[in-house]
Amino acid sequence: MTTRIEVYAGVCGHSAVIDVTKVDDTHVQVVITSACDQITAMNPDLARVQWKGKGHEVFKRMTESAVYQSAAQHIRHTACPIPTAILKAIEVEAGIALPKDVTITFSSPAPNGSPTDESYDGGESIEEIK
């Protein structure tokens, strides 16, 4: 079986489809499909990751997780939700969590001077906007 999730990352305008397939009792394969080159650059790193057992690579401290290490190498936007989405999909595919949507909702408008949907096209980094 394969667990598939869809992620709409936000203002960058990129979405991703993440497929996680259990390869055996301790390993999964992650395949990310997206127009974002930074996200898809993670595919080789996550082609086979050990999620369970001695020496597992996934459910560790953030700085030690294979998912977050790959993200640190390839994704320039620290707040990108894709790494978290990958981990959630691995949990479901491994049978250690139920498939439940995760939501981030802003309950107040952007402060004056902040980028808005009208002024930010997602093509620049935050540093380039300042």
Where are these regions (language model features)?
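Ser/Thr- (and often Asn-) enriched beta-sheet segments in non-cytosolic proteins
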Residues: 4, 31, 103-105
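Active-site- and interface-proximal helix/loop "cap" or "latch" segments in soluble metabolic
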Residues: 23-87, 97-98
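Short, charged/polar N-terminal "headpieces" of proteins
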Residues: 1-28
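C-terminal binding/interaction regions
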Residues: 65, 69, 73-75, 92, ...
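A broad, structure-centric signal for solvent-exposed, well-ordered loop/edge residues
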Residues: 14, 39, 111-113
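Phosphate-binding glycine-rich loops and adjacent basic patches that engage nucleotide phosphates
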Residues: 1-10, 46-56, 93
